[in-house]
Design a protein with these regions (language model features):
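Hydrophobic h-region of N-terminal signal peptides that target proteins for export
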Residues: 17-25
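N-terminal secretory targeting signals
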Residues: 8, 24-30
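Compact, glycine-rich, soluble single-domain proteins
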Residues: 28-149
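Sec-dependent signal peptide recognition
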Residues: 7-18
Length: 149
């Protein structure tokens, strides 16, 4: 085989590996959340968002609380008076999950988004991992908001 041909094959192989790697990194998926959760409580009023899941000692396995803010900005949550370990996903206005955090019961430390968010979804701790939902995935927001009507 000629040296030129071998060089071509090597570069082609490297390019193929790069394409596979880039596609793997962008392997986000669309999430139809009602395929995963049986019940979603939507909170959009200020007083409801402030209360969140406070004072509840348990929540069902396939339950979530969906927070809606009037506009997209950096958001914060805390676990004051919340007895259940939770995970929170911060979600941008297009439905993309930008961040996921685990939160400690009764903690007064704020868990803030780094990026601007319009929505958040709180669920039992570990729920996102268990359901293989991760940052970059896109939640179909319209399905949630129309389901509430």
């Amino acid at each position: 085989m000629s040296r030129l041909y071998l060089n071509f094959v090597q570069k082609s192989f490297k390019y193929l590996i790069l394409l596979i790697h880039v596609n793997y990194l962008d392997a986000s998926k669309d999430i139809h959340i009602y395929e995963y959760l049986d019940e979603i409580e939507i909170v959009s009023k200020l007083e409801d968002r402030k209360k969140g899941l406070m004072y509840r000692e348990t929540i069902p396995d396939n339950y979530g609380m969906f927070f809606v803010w009037p506009y997209e900005k950096k958001q914060c949550m805390w676990m004051k008076d919340t007895y259940v370990p939770l995970s929170v996903a911060y979600i941008d206005e297009k439905g993309k999950i930008t961040e996921i955090y685990d939160m400690v019961p009764l903690s007064k430390n704020s868990v803030c988004s780094i990026k601007a968010s319009k929505y958040a979804l709180e669920v039992n701790s570990g729920w996102f991992d268990k359901n293989e939902i991760m940052t970059g995935d896109v939640i179909k927001i319209k399905e949630i908001l129309s389901h509430d009507k």
